[in-house]
Amino acid sequence: MLIIIRPSGEIALKSPRSRRNFEHTLANNIRSVIKEGKIWRSQGVLFLEVNDNNKNIEELSKVFGIASFSPVMSIKSYNNNLEDIINKAKEVFAEIVKGKIFSVRAKRIGSHNFTSLDVQRKVGEALYPFSRGVNLENPEVEVFIEIRNDVAYFYYKIIKGPRGLPVGVAGKTVVLFSGGIDSPVATWMMMKRGSIPVILNFNLGGSVHRKFVLEELSVLRKWSGGHKLKLFIVNGTDVLIKLSQIEKRNRVVMLKRVMYKVAERLCDKANAKSITTGESLSQVSSQTMTNLYVTEYGIKYPIFRPLIGFDKEEIVELARKIGTYEYSIKLPEYCAISTKARTSVELNEVLKDEENLNIDYEKVLENSEVIEI
């Protein structure tokens, strides 16, 4: 089976050097997902040749960096022989257009003694007797012929990919992963922009929390382009015991700040250059602009919040699409440790609490459980 893979449009806009790097990374990710076969680059697309019974092909729809792909049949058209193309088109498409209104779409790369319109017209005439008619504006079925120099490719399916950038081209980011609805979606969105996520989870719910986090990450692993996901599980109950020493109204923001501080240490360890969270502006009291400012004050790494402008319905819609929603919805909100959280915490108060608590963030990270998925 031969498959033509069309990279995301933005990859084509990169400089020649960056484009080669992105396409090389995409090819490696495809190899990791498909497990076998031959892949090569050619004039802005990738070709993948695999066994006909390869069951991993459908997984290409979850490989970031792919705009679309199509299983194709091909012939070598010597001396620009249009008759060869017409005969092959009849062989491939006669059953596809049978009893249906159809259209032919053709495109060419290279020098030929015929135009794309010639191909569309001649192939359309050859297929017409098998069909119920032609409608270029609203056909029931479209058939495609793509001629690249002396090879013609025939296909009738265009399967959409997730677009974005190949996972790995943008480096690593440490993701604060609670396991709720938001953090898996934020992780997915950063992978879509080419980042490899390093997952940091504060376990506040024991084995149940751990179970659902692992299930969510198993879903996200299918979108990772073959990259393994590294999970660091911190014992959050030890942190909560510490936080019981400060005022209730400051605890939620202080907990988030502890998470940021541990994430900062993990960035150092994992050679990640950013921290990612699932925070959305004003969604809850800890996510007001003031509290976000206090939470990230003094953190040396950039903090990415891909969901910052999303409402909950939009986030839920994405979670359903990704496949994590069914697990996230079963998980209690463990970070809601105070019913009297303030929407505007004072920075000086939090810094004073932080000094008094004197948490050893390095030790918190050292005592974490590490799992590779």
From Swiss-Prot:
InterPro entries: Rossmann-like_a/b/a_fold (IPR014729), ThiI_AANH (IPR020536), ThiI_fer (IPR054173), ThiI_N (IPR049961), THUMP_dom (IPR004114), THUMP_ThiI (IPR049962), tRNA_STrfase (IPR003720), tRNA_sulfurtransferase_ThiI (IPR050102)
Swiss-Prot/TrEMBL keywords: ATP-binding, Cytoplasm, Nucleotide-binding, RNA-binding, Thiamine biosynthesis, Transferase, tRNA-binding
EC category: transferase
THUMP domain residues: 54-158
GO molecular function terms listed in the Swiss-Prot or TrEMBL record: ATP binding; CCA tRNA nucleotidyltransferase activity; tRNA binding; tRNA-uracil-4 sulfurtransferase activity
Pathway: Cofactor biosynthesis; thiamine diphosphate biosynthesis
Pfam families with a match to the protein in the record: ThiI (PF02568), ThiI_fer (PF22025), THUMP (PF02926)
EC number: 2.8.1.4
PROSITE patterns: THUMP
GO biological process: thiamine biosynthetic process; thiamine diphosphate biosynthetic process; thiazole biosynthetic process; tRNA 4-thiouridine biosynthesis
Subcellular location per the Swiss-Prot or TrEMBL entry: Cytoplasm
GO cellular component terms given for this protein: cytosol
The reaction(s) this protein catalyses: [ThiI sulfur-carrier protein]-S-sulfanyl-L-cysteine + a uridine in tRNA + 2 reduced [2Fe-2S]-[ferredoxin] + ATP + H(+) = [ThiI sulfur-carrier protein]-L-cysteine + a 4-thiouridine in tRNA + 2 oxidized [2Fe-2S]-[ferredoxin] + AMP + diphosphate; [ThiS sulfur-carrier protein]-C-terminal Gly-Gly-AMP + S-sulfanyl-L-cysteinyl-[cysteine desulfurase] + AH2 = [ThiS sulfur-carrier protein]-C-terminal-Gly-aminoethanethioate + L-cysteinyl-[cysteine desulfurase] + A + AMP + 2 H(+)
Family: Belongs to the ThiI family.
Functional summary from the UniProt entry: Catalyzes the ATP-dependent transfer of a sulfur to tRNA to produce 4-thiouridine in position 8 of tRNAs, which functions as a near-UV photosensor. Also catalyzes the transfer of sulfur to the sulfur carrier protein ThiS, forming ThiS-thiocarboxylate. This is a step in the synthesis of thiazole, in the thiamine biosynthesis pathway. The sulfur is donated as persulfide by IscS.
Protein name from the UniProt record: Probable tRNA sulfurtransferase
